[in-house]
Amino acid sequence: MKNIKLTLAYDGTNYHGFQEQRGTGLATIQEALEKALSTIAQTPIQVIGAGRTDAGVHAQGQVVNFRSEKWPVPAEKAPLALNVLLPGDIKVVKAEEVPMDFHARFSAVAKTYRYSIYHHRVMSPFHRYYCYHEPRRLDVNAMQEGAAYLLGTYDFKSFQAQGTPVKDTIRTIYRADIIEDAPVINLYLRGNGFLYNMVRIITGTLLNIGFGKIKPEDMVKIIESKNRTLAGTTAPPQGLCLMEVEY
């Protein structure tokens, strides 16, 4: 029995998220990957993903693992073998054999996400699937001030999609940076875990700070309230990218 860890990069534009949606006929990253794996192994292969990215969300460093008794390809050659079978918008960038107790989701200690905003009057056609377009004036310095209040361990219930069945909403944020590379503004968040839609809701809240609708220090009140209605709207999916999963 082998346990193989794969690092993936994908453009999520044409997929209904990472997780397989059986019986729906909807294209997913997991479905495409398992099809390629099963073709090579000549037996059904199921993968475990580090994160379930939503429809339209991208990844540069998604991680999965799978266990198989019949996997015939050495780990170092797996990317080449798989990439021949995978569509052009999904690629395996690294493969390695790992201990049997490795679990792509539960072994993770940190994840980094990036949310990209195209800040210009006219949206670039080359960025339309990878950035959220915001033509209005933004105070980026105020947004950075607001992001700094996210650092630390808090109950982030205010930044979780309503109706999500998660009891433990306490998370730790290690990094919250806004880096402007005009006309793109990138928000980087690194934490020990993220609630459903957490990064996109944080982005919407920081945009409200950038618009001057709320003050940077209001981020503290929003966190303490544990009230989703006080946070900003959920930013669109296309600006979000899973950059790295750490173990």
Curated annotation (Swiss-Prot):
**Catalysed reactions listed for this entry:** uridine(38/39/40) in tRNA = pseudouridine(38/39/40) in tRNA
Q: What UniProt keywords are attached to this protein's entry?
A: Isomerase, tRNA processing
User: GO molecular function terms here?
Assistant: RNA binding; tRNA pseudouridine(38-40) synthase activity
Q: What class of enzyme is it?
A: isomerase
Q: Active site located where?
A: 54 (nucleophile)
Q: Which GO terms describe its biological process?
A: tRNA pseudouridine synthesis
EC number(s) reported in the record: 5.4.99.12
Give coiled-coil spans as residue ranges: none
* Residues noted as binding substrate in the record, renumbered to the chain: 113
Q: What does this protein do?
A: Formation of pseudouridine at positions 38, 39 and 40 in the anticodon stem and loop of transfer RNAs.
Q: Which HAMAP family match?
A: TruA
The record describes its quaternary structure and partners as:
Homodimer.
Family designation: Belongs to the tRNA pseudouridine synthase TruA family.
Protein name in the entry = tRNA pseudouridine synthase A
Source organism per entry reads Desulforamulus reducens (strain ATCC BAA-1160 / DSM 100696 / MI-1)
**Species classification:** Bacteria, Bacillati, Bacillota, Clostridia, Eubacteriales
What's the encoding gene here?
truA
